Amino acid sequence: MTTLRSGHATSPRLTWYGPDSERVELSGRVLDNWVAKTSNLLQDELDAEPGMRLNLDLPAHWKSMIWALSAWQLGMETVLDGGEAELLVTDRPGTLEGKYDAVIAVALPALAMRWPGELPAGVLDYAAEVRSHGDVFMAHTDPSAAACAIRARAGQQHIHENLITGFAASHEEGVRLLVPASEGLEPALADALGAWHSGGSVVLAHPDVELTDKLLNAERIHGK
């Protein structure tokens, strides 16, 4: 999993196109840095450990990719079907339902330094907290390869050992893959893992972004 994130250290690994001409490009090194900081936040601030469940209530977005990779690095279970979990990561903290040990609010705009407005009591502001955490992650407890890594929307479960062989989509070697965010978080995660495993990279596009020939050519989209 570390190789998937950090490969191609100086070249694009994950590119995001969002509303209002937003473009975010993460090289392998920068992607790994974001995952390390988020993993440290989970472990050091929220006492996350292998086997804990994280409800990932976010749309397909570059930050939801970071959260999934971080949870897997700790050996956690990423919950996509809205089921029970100890932690909730959401961009909708004002509509909380269910009981969680901790709730983390994620502001989606790339330049957001904190949540825009007042948060419910006890909710952690991801944008305000994540940058203070370390750039290198060292797990306190070794995760189990046989533990559940993801609980998908249709009820399927995949263990950590089988994330690539059982969950990730198959893609051509070195693909520069266009992933429409409109298809949802689960397919986006599967596509991204498959593209990275093949030595490729991902362009993730918000549903409101017009996928013009100019954009596709500029990003050198190729392969399947």
Regions found by a protein language model. Name each.
Residues D57-H61, A181-L185:
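Conserved AMP-binding
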Residues L178-V179, L204:
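Conserved binding-pocket/active-site segment within a compact domain
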Residues T2-T3, L69-A145, V203-K224:
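Structural core segment of the AMP-binding/adenylate-forming
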Residues T2-L26, D135-I159:
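AMP-dependent adenylate-forming
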Residues S11, D32-N55, Q73, N162-L178:
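ANL superfamily AMP-binding
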Residues S70-Q73, A188-V202:
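Conserved short alpha-helical elements in the N-terminal third of ANL/AMP-binding
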